[in-house]
Amino acid sequence: MKWKIGMGTCLMIGLMACQSPQNEPSKLTEEGVSLELAQFRKAHFSAIHYQLFFSIPAERQQPVEGEVEIRFQTEQPQPLILDFRAEPEQVKQVELNGQSVAYTVQAEHIVIAKEHISAGENRVRVHFTPADQSLNRREEFLYTLLVPDRARTLFPCFDQPNLKALFTLTLEVP
């Protein structure tokens, strides 16, 4: 009898260990970048390249508009969780591999379900309006000081220091 209980307990523990709740976006999307989210993305995403575009209007009262294309590699489909600290209506459109895709905006993140992600290279394009908190706009110039964990206030990204990436930046200025 003790043997059966012991084997049953071992089997239950083994089955629970095989589950991967880390892959569920709801477990990873809390405000900011949790250690679990950072470790998840470091393990699953590589070869990251950002192609950023910002349109700066002549009038300071008009909002800056932005677009980012993020290319990345993944060995198997995983949920894509991008950091973007802005209101949901500031996300205008999201495309994945050239097609519009369903997404949610929750707790400072843009989330795309793993069903939409392919093994290999993926390209996500987000049209957005940046939050003003990181933009220091003056009459003749604009600057930003993106200290660690603040890039997500300006554009959708993987805002963690252990995911290195290449950047291409294009500005449309008056």
Q: Across the structure, where does each feature detected by a protein language model lie?
A:
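Beta-strand-rich interaction surfaces with strong enrichment in secreted/lumenal proteins
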Residues: 53-55, 70, 100-101, 112-116, ...
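Intrinsic-disorder/low-complexity, polar/charged segments enriched in Ser/Thr/Lys/Arg/Asp/Glu/Gln
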Residues: 49-51, 63-69, 77-81, 109, ...
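A surface-exposed beta-strand-loop module
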Residues: 85-142
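Extended, low-hydrophobicity, Ser/Thr/Pro/Gly-biased non-transmembrane segments
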Residues: 127-174
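Positively charged n-region of N-terminal signal peptides that target proteins for export
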Residues: 1-4
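N-terminal, polar/Ser/Thr-rich
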Residues: 18-65, 92, 137-140, 159-161
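Bacterial N-terminal signal peptides
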Residues: 6-15
